[in-house]
């Protein structure tokens, strides 16, 4: 869509230009948004013919962000023009696009053809638009659906950054207690260890388990921590984190569980990460009403620490050891597949990235 034959014109901002960044930051601040240029790839701004700022829109990957229109222009076509322009731009690159917004605003996107996937009242709604949808992910799940004789169908979602003996222990336990285990591997490539590497380390590490089916997480089995929160600046951080987890778990419950007939979801007891702790709480709150039992397994430990408390295995300890160049100190935490990879030249780039402080869990 172009802005020809309208009362508006649009410009793409230079995010390396402090003036341009200040322009959109000041505009959004008046509307209650805190603009962070590091969280977007492209930003456009719309003016009327008098040069007044009408609205703005940005994107990060396939996610629309910072879509906002000044109050006095909200009865115009400005919102529709911005969303349509940005969506058409993204659909030239991706097969579909997402937007996160407050539930009370979702109707405006629905009116432009977006479909609501899930809502976590009162903070989040997730909508999508494009040539593909969550139903395509369900079609993929149907291709890996296993034939089972019992209701012992379990699931687990892992990131494995990297794959540790803690992950292996949890997967082996689930496999020993169920007919089938669907192991979802988070696919978003924001971790220090890329998806392809994590997938291969897991595959090699559990090749002895014939009843575990590895599943690509796609764009729907993700980490809620990537969900934007720029429109929630006045909300309590813990509330935002909890609603991010709730939104993610609702997607799993509504779209994944019915396709695969999942009856259990295994999780490790969380002692370190507030995000994972929020996820575990959301699962315990939501999944039982969908017929899914949440089984929390005590995290595997290797001896005790200096204070005689259990020395739990965690991927973060492995990354910390890599950063400190003390990989030999954490060998007991690693299965053969991960250990062999980390001592190979193939891991050099990843180890360097961790030492430079890049990548997250």
List each language-model region with its residue ranges:
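Short coil/loop residues immediately preceding or within conserved phosphate-binding loops
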Residues: 41, 64, 151
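Conserved GNAT acetyl-CoA-binding A-motif
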Residues: 89-103
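A short, internal acetyl-CoA/4′-phosphopantetheine-binding micro-motif in the GNAT/acyltransferase core
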Residues: 67-76
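Short amphipathic alpha-helix that is part of the acyltransferase structural core
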Residues: 1-35
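Nucleotidyltransferase catalytic core that binds NTPs
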Residues: 101, 105-114, 118-361
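Conserved beta-strand in the GNAT
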Residues: 45, 51-68
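Conserved acetyl-CoA-binding loop-helix of GNAT-fold acetyltransferases
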Residues: 75-88, 166-172
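Short, well-ordered alpha-helix to beta-strand connector turns
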Residues: 41-42, 94, 178, 262
């Amino acid at each position: 869509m172009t802005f020809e034959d309208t009362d508006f014109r649009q410009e793409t901002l230079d995010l390396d230009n402090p003036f341009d960044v200040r322009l959109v930051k000041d505009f959004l601040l008046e509307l209650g948004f805190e603009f962070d240029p590091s969280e977007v790839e492209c930003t456009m701004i719309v003016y009327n013919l008098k040069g007044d700022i009408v609205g703005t829109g940005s994107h990060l990957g396939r996610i629309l962000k910072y879509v906002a229109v000044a109050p006095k222009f909200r009865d115009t076509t400005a919102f529709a023009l911005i969303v349509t322009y940005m969506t058409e731009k993204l659909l030239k690159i991706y097969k579909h696009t997402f937007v996160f917004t407050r539930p009370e605003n979702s109707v405006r996107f629905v009116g432009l053809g977006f479909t609501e996937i899930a809502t976590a009242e009162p903070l989040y709604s997730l909508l999508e638009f494009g040539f593909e949808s969550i139903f395509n992910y369900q079609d993929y799940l149907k291709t890996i659906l296993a034939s089972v004789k019992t209701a012992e169908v379990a699931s687990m979602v892992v990131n494995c950054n990297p794959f540790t003996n803690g992950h292996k222990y949890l997967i082996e336990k689930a496999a020993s207690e169920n007919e089938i285990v669907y192991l979802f591997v988070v696919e978003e490539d924001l971790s220090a260890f890329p998806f392809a590497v994590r997938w291969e380390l897991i595959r090699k590490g559990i090749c002895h388990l014939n009843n575990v089916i590895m599943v690509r997480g796609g764009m729907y089995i993700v980490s809620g921590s990537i969900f934007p929160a720029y429109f929630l600046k006045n909300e309590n951080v813990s509330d935002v984190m909890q609603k991010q987890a709730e939104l993610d778990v609702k997607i799993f419950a509504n779209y994944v569980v019915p396709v695969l007939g999942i009856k259990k979801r295994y999780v490790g007891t969380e002692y370190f990460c507030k995000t994972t702790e929020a996820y575990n709480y959301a699962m315990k709150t939501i999944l039982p009403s969908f017929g899914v039992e949440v089984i929390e397994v005590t995290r595997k430990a290797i001896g005790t620490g200096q204070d005689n408390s259990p020395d739990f295995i965690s991927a973060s300890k492995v990354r910390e050891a890599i950063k400190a160049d003390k990989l030999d100190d954490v060998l007991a935490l690693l299965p053969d597949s991960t250990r062999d990879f980390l001592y190979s030249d193939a891991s050099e780039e990843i180890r360097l990235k961790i030492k430079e402080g890049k990548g997250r869990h």
